Amino acid sequence: MRRPKKYESGEATQYISRRAALRKLQLSLNDFRRLCILKGVYPREPKHRRRAQKGSSEIRVLYHTKDIRFLLHEQIVWTLRDYKIFAKKSNRDRAIKDFRNLKRRLALFPEIKLDHIVKERYPTFIDALKDLDDCLTLLFLFSTFPSLHLIPREQSNLCRRLTVEFLHYVIASKSLRKVFISIKGYYFQAEIKGQKVTWIVPHYYPFKPQSRQEVDFKVMSIFVEFYTIMLGFTNFRLFHGLNLAYPPQFPTNMLQDNEDTFKDESSFVSDRIAALNFELLRTDKVQEDEEELDIDMELLEQDGDSKRIIKMKQEAQEVARLRTLFKGLKFFINREVPREPLVIIIRSFGGKVSWDSSIFPGSTFDESDETITHQIVDRPSLATQYISRDYIQPQWLFDCVNQRQLLPTNKYFIGEKLPPHLSPFVDSKRDTYIPPEEKALHDPSLIETHEQSDDDSDEEAAQEEEEAVDQELLDAQLQLAYQQETAEYKKYGGPDGVNEDEEDPEEDEEDEDEEEEEELDEQAKRLKEEKQKMSVQSGKVHKVNKRQLHKAEVDEHRLQARMVKPRHRNLFRKLIREKQTKEKEEWLLRKKRRTFEAGEKEARKTAKRAARKEAAAAAAKASKLGK
């Protein structure tokens, strides 16, 4: 029997280094990276690196051997090899100045087709929706970039077109559920086919070029190349699910014959599509989302009234109310407010919106329209204001959507200090520190009240003492009335006031003597029992020794650590460190909260003192004038 050699089986054959993979595929490093990104192949971390590297302790980039075999049968490998041949021949034509042949070669430039890779990586439509988060975030980012060396203008325009099409679907389907503003940008979450899709739209700042060391645009552009194909397929499927024409089109009654349409109809239509303020053309006019919702509710009602069904009914009713949150409201967006994120929010929940026509095409009404209910402003003051509308800050829209109701606008007026903007993406049932504002968001009954002053607390204490004294007097009166009633009962011999012992005086006297003896015995027993009950005993104060409690907890923790198996100790230590980190963060947050509340309390006291001083000064001044 042949003795097996070392590193010919097991973990050593499961992994392959990147250099060996390049030799096997006959590709350059850049082409290999591109192929791995498109196919979804990533480096792997072995459990025992020394065994996987056949005894070498040098840290190398490793891949699964099966993944590299999988890449050997890919059609793109031949296209990437054709690039090398094309580059050599085109350089030769340039060198000999054969421009006729060079032009012919450029027309036959080899193109990579990624359709089969999208179908391969996402067998079902739901799989594509699950991986849509990173796709949308990256495409929204690239849609804001100008033309760069590694980012051609056509790629940025394609990203912009695909993202606008997706936003039109979100508006038409009313599938937006959560929104949030942060330093990174605007967070949006939509529910599509039962899947929650979250993406970030960056803030509209001027572009600042980055150095090569910070951002690798070449690798990012490869991801964008794949994600554009994927989102194109997804948009096509989503639009046809709502019976919308794809690519997006407008009804014929919207394309009026004016100077803009005569000049360039395609640019006119593209500008209106980018405005996100118009309904798109439908292939089937009969499209009622409310009917589908009613059908679903009927199906739920047939299933019974279990807790799960009741919860599903409540969620469906909340979503139905949320879809029409801004129905019947008209908004006007000022110049300083970012237009696109607010248009998405307002139109996704049934509202109407417009802006100044000089900012962007697609406005439907002017600022002077008297039917406007809300005007969104982000400046400290405004010169001209209308009485018929509310002037609010943009945060009001986001908070209304997250709380799923129209909030009062008095906290969001111009120049008002805004309430804290809480994230809806945080789990409300977590074990970490939850600020009181977030508790009030989920349960309005938990809103914290202001601390009472010393005068109010003294008045309440005096009132409680008076109530206690009244209760004692009432108990004494009831006890006296009971004693009088029992004495009358004994005196007259019964409840009817009839003395039955008058018929036989001798027997009555004997019975009375026996009853008196029994009553005396019972009274003696009662007195003994009452004395035992009313006896005062010296109590012992149970002092809690905090040091002993802490020591007991430490001993218990050490015992748990000893009970852990040796192979699980690293995991146990990691969990303990995470727990300690969370506790420390929670302690720091509570400390910050206490400092903040103490500062606010001191500020209120200072303001009260200043107001009292001003009032006293005004009174003194008035008294002097009166004299």
Swiss-Prot record:
Acidic residues biased stretches: 453-471, 498-521
Biased amino acid composition, Basic and acidic residues: 522-533, 550-559, 596-605
BRCT domain segment(s): 321-414
CDD domains: BRCT_pescadillo_like
Keywords of this entry: Nucleus, Phosphoprotein, Ribosome biogenesis, rRNA processing
Gene3D superfamilies registered for this protein in UniProt: BRCT domain
Subcellular location: Nucleus, Nucleolus; Nucleus, Nucleoplasm
Compositional bias segments (type: Low complexity): 616-627
Domain of life: Eukaryota
Family from the record: Belongs to the pescadillo family.
Protein name per Swiss-Prot or TrEMBL: Pescadillo homolog
Protein species of origin: Drosophila ananassae
